[in-house]
UniProtKB/Swiss-Prot annotation:
<dbReference type="Pfam" id="PF05167">
    <property type="entry name" value="DUF711"/>
</dbReference>
<dbReference type="InterPro" id="IPR007841">
    <property type="entry name" value="UPF0210"/>
</dbReference>
<protein>
    <recommendedName>
        <fullName>UPF0210 protein EUBREC_1565</fullName>
    </recommendedName>
</protein>
<comment type="similarity">
    <text>Belongs to the UPF0210 family.</text>
</comment>
<comment type="subunit">
    <text>Homodimer.</text>
</comment>
Length: 454
C-alpha cells in the first residue's frame, strides 16, 4: 500500500532534486527499407519513421501531464545506416542524402534527436562502412538532429585499428567543418567498443539488428536524488552508504518503468529496456561529481575517486535491476565533463585530468565523454586516445566510448560553449608525445584470451 510519505517523497524528487526521465527512445528497424535505388531508400526511410513515430512526442507529453514527471527528450534510433544504405550508396555524398532524410523525418515528428547514422566495424570495414565514416563530417554539417556512432571493437573480435585511425582523421575534419555551428558536429558523434543494441542515450543510440521491428527504450536520470539521499547519511559506514544508494536507485528506476510501460501501451510498441544510468546535466544539483564529493571526496579526481565511482555504479545497478523487468543499454553513471558542473569545477581546479578520467572509465559507463581538447591536437593523437579507451572496454568486457571535441582555435584553459543539455567544457591538456608509429601500423588488435568461452 502506498502511503502519503512516499507520495511526498516522489514529489520532492521531481520538484527539488531534478528527477526526470531523460529520454523515451523509439527504436525503429529500417531493414525493410533497403533497396538498390537511392531515391526509393530515402522514401522508404522517411515513410516508415514518420508513420511509426508520429505520436511519440504527443504521447510523451501526455504521460508528463498525467504523472507530472518531466520527460526531457523524445528520441528515435534506427538500424545502422551503413547496413541500410549499402546497396544503394556508391559515394559518401549518397550517404549524406540519407542523413538529410533522417533529419527531415525527425523534424516532421518533432523529436529532439535521431540516432543510428552508424557503422559496426569491430572486425573490418565494408565499402559501405568506409563511405559512411568518411561522410560523417558533411552529414553533421548539413543536419541538425542526426547523431552518429561507430563501433570499432569488441571483446569477441578485438579492435579494428584501421577504423580507429580513420575516425581520428574524421573527428578532426568534423571539428573543422562544423566550427562555426552552435553545436560542434563532434558532440553528436561517439566511437564505441562493445556498443549495445538497445542504448536509448544519444549520441550513441542505434537500433540493433537483433531487435524487433520497433521497441521502446527509456533512460532515467537522478543524480540530484542520490546526492540528497546521501546527505542524510553523512559519516555513516559503507554498508549504510551502499544501502542508501540502492534504495534510491530502485525508486528512480521504478519511475522509468512506469513511463516505459505507459509509452509502450499508448504507442502499441513493445517495451524494450530501462537504462539505469545516472545522467547529469549542467544544472546545479544534478551532478555525478557532486555525488562523489558527498561520498567523501574534496573534488572529483582526488585519490579515491575511482573507488567511489565503482561503488556508486555498482549500487545503482543493484538497486535499479530490482525495479524493472528488463534493464539494458549503458546502465551506470555517466561522467561527461561538459554536462556536469561538478566535473567542470574539478577540471578548472586542477583536480581532474584526462588520465584520471580514463581510469574512472574502467569502472563506469561509458567513457571519455564530452571532453574538449586543443584544436591543434593531431589526428593520430585522437586515434591513440580512442585506442586506449577501446582497449579498456575490450579487456574488461564492458561498453566504453569516446566523444572528443577538438576546439578549433582554442587551447588549454579556454572554454567551449556548447549550450543546452550539453553545457560548456574547459579545454583539457593532452599528452603531446607522439603515437604516430603505433596508429599507422594498420590492421587490428586481436581479441583477448579470455574472450574464448566456447
Amino acid at each position: 500500500m502506498i502511503n502519503i510519505g512516499e507520495v511526498i517523497e516522489t514529489n520532492d524528487m521531481v520538484e527539488k532534486e531534478n528527477l526526470d526521465v531523460r529520454t523515451i527512445t523509439l527504436g525503429i528497424s529500417l531493414l525493410d527499407c533497403i533497396d538498390s535505388d537511392l531515391a526509393k531508400v530515402n522514401e522508404n526511410i522517411y515513410n516508415k519513421i514518420t508513420t511509426l513515430a508520429k505520436n511519440l512526442v504527443s504521447t510523451g507529453k501526455e504521460i508528463e501531464n498525467n504523472y507530472c514527471i518531466p520527460i526531457v527528450n523524445k528520441r528515435i534510433s534506427v538500424t545502422p545506416i551503413a547496413l541500410v544504405g549499402g546497396a544503394a550508396c556508391k559515394s559518401s555524398e549518397d550517404f549524406v542524402t540519407i542523413a538529410k532524410t533522417l533529419d527531415r523525418a525527425a523534424k516532421e515528428v518533432g523529436v529532439n534527436f535521431i540516432g543510428g547514422y552508424s557503422a559496426l566495424v569491430s572486425k573490418g570495414m565494408t565499402k559501405a562502412d568506409e563511405l559512411l565514416i568518411k561522410s560523417i563530417p558533411q552529414a553533421m554539417l548539413e543536419t541538425d538532429l542526426v547523431c552518429s556512432s561507430v563501433n570499432v571493437g569488441s571483446t569477441k573480435t578485438g579492435i579494428n585499428m584501421d577504423a580507429v585511425k580513420l575516425i581520428g582523421e574524421m573527428i578532426k575534419e568534423t571539428a573543422e567543418v562544423t566550427k562555426h555551428l552552435p553545436v560542434s558536429g563532434c558532440a553528436k558523434f561517439v566511437v564505441f567498443c562493445n556498443a549495445p543494441d538497445d542504448n536509448p542515450f544519444m549520441a550513441g543510440a542505434f537500433h540493433g539488428v537483433t531487435e524487433a521491428d520497433a521497441i521502446i527504450n527509456v533512460g532515467v536520470s537522478g543524480p540530484g536524488v542520490v546526492k540528497t539521499a546521501l546527505e542524510k547519511v553523512r559519516g555513516e559506514n559503507f554498508e549504510v552508504l551502499c544501502e542508501t544508494i540502492k534504495k534510491t536507485a530502485f525508486k528512480v528506476t521504478r519511475v522509468g518503468q512506469l513511463v516505459a510501460k505507459e509509452a509502450s501501451k499508448k504507442l502499441g510498441v513493445p517495451f524494450g529496456i530501462i537504462d539505469l544510468s545516472l545522467a547529469p546535466t549542467p544544472a546545479i544539483g544534478d551532478s555525478v561529481a557532486d555525488i562523489l564529493c558527498e561520498i567523501g571526496l574534496e573534488r572529483a579526481g582526488a585519490p579515491g575517486t575511482t573507488a567511489a565511482l565503482a561503488l556508486l555504479n555498482d549500487q545503482v545497478k543493484k538497486g535499479g535491476i530490482m525495479a524493472s523487468s528488463y534493464v539494458g543499454g549503458l546502465s551506470g553513471a555517466f561522467i561527461p565533463v561538459s554536462e556536469d558542473q561538478g566535473m567542470i569545477d574539478a577540471v578548472n581546479d586542477g583536480a581532474l585530468t584526462l588520465e584520471k578520467l580514463e581510469a574512472m572509465t574502467c569502472v563506469c559507463s561509458v567513457g571519455l565523454d564530452m571532453i574538449a581538447i586543443p584544436g591543434d591536437t593531431k589526428a593520430t593523437t585522437i586515434s591513440g586516445i580512442i585506442a586506449d579507451e577501446m582497449a579498456i572496454g575490450m579487456i574488461n568486457q564492458k561498453t566504453t566510448a569516446c566523444r572528443l571535441l577538438p576546439a578549433i582555435g582554442k587551447d588549454v584553459g579556454d572554454v567551449v560553449e556548447i549550450g543546452g543539455l550539453l553545457g560548456s567544457a574547459p579545454v583539457m591538456p593532452v599528452n603531446r608525445f607522439s603515437c604516430d608509429a603505433f596508429v599507422n601500423r594498420g590492421g587490428r588488435i586481436p581479441a583477448p584470451i579470455h574472450s574464448f568461452k566456447n
